[in-house]
Amino acid sequence: SKWEIGREEFYKQCYEFCMTNASNAREQEKNIGLSADYSREFFTLDPRLTKTVYETFEMMFKQGLVYRDKRIVNVCPNCKTALADIDTQHEERRGIFAYIKYPVVGSKDKYIMVATTRPETMLGDSAVAVNPKDERYLEFIGKKVLLPIQNKEIPVIADESVDMEMGTGAVKVTPAHSPIDFELGKKHNLEIVNVINEEGKMTGDIPKKYKGLDTISCSKQLCEDLDKLGLLEEIQNIKHEVAVCERCLTPVEPIISNQWYLNVNQLAKKALDSLKSGETKVIPKGQQRALEFFYENIQPWCISRQLWWGQRIPVWYSGGKKVYDWLNENEGKTVKDFETEF
């Protein structure tokens, strides 16, 4: 594996492979009818391109368009890297819908039933949320339930975003492992509890028997344990859409992590204003609202990766260097000479 041979040797082998097979790639492109001006050919990691990338990064950094932030992001446990939303795709996979009882604290024989496709994440639950208009749960709002297995009291909160028709109308809230729950957690100031790491293994402050298990194994074990406790109502076998890595098709894990982001919201505003003013026209016109919705709901774009091959982010975390120092001090060098971690 690349971890066994190390970064430098891995880069060397990738570089040699690219150089050896470049001519084959050109011939294949010509064979399929590609017409290109090969006098303008550039290798991805050509020093000239690297310089342009870093100059652009510097410019955007100074403008506040790129920044480092700790927020929830897609992580591929197999590739071991963060991914942007566009780097994932959705596939139909077999799964389960587990109906779990959360006992109401101080109320004998009363509980709130929660339906979830990911029982393993319940170990990191911070609340149970219900719709304030849902008469079934009005008496429980503001009270607490006992989080099964963890034996921890968590609040019952009210939020209008909860779909009363979905599942049981009550949802578990796991801010550390769901983008929707992350935003809900910020809104209600909920605790963030990480229970899954970047390798897709169970971790954190959880019972020892679950630590180190992959998420699927943990889900099965939890359901067995909940059943023994009389807290598992039923399990339905379902088919549902799962976000997977576009490279290896491994299901991604939403995990809170420090990454670098592009503030596309600021850029999207200009495009949105252009649409609404009529400066930009959409054909067919009926699709304009869909494009406006996309711009209105766009999220920060994660641009950092934990991969060893590609342009590297020109940022130091020690030594006092600034982002732009590399450009002046290392002009003409290849990217493999640039030593930084991100």
Per-region residue spans from a language model:
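Residue patterns forming the tRNA-binding/recognition surfaces of aminoacyl-tRNA synthetases
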Residues: 1-111, 166, 170-326
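Glycine-rich (often Gly-Gly/Gly-Pro-rich) flexible segments and glycine-rich loop motifs
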Residues: 320-342
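Intrinsic disorder/low-structure terminal segments
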Residues: 41-42, 136-139, 209, 260, ...
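Cytochrome P450 catalytic domain signature, combining two hallmark sequence patches
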Residues: 136-138, 143, 191-194, 282, ...
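Short secondary-structure junctions
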Residues: 141-144, 231-237, 340
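Protease-associated
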Residues: 108-173, 177-183
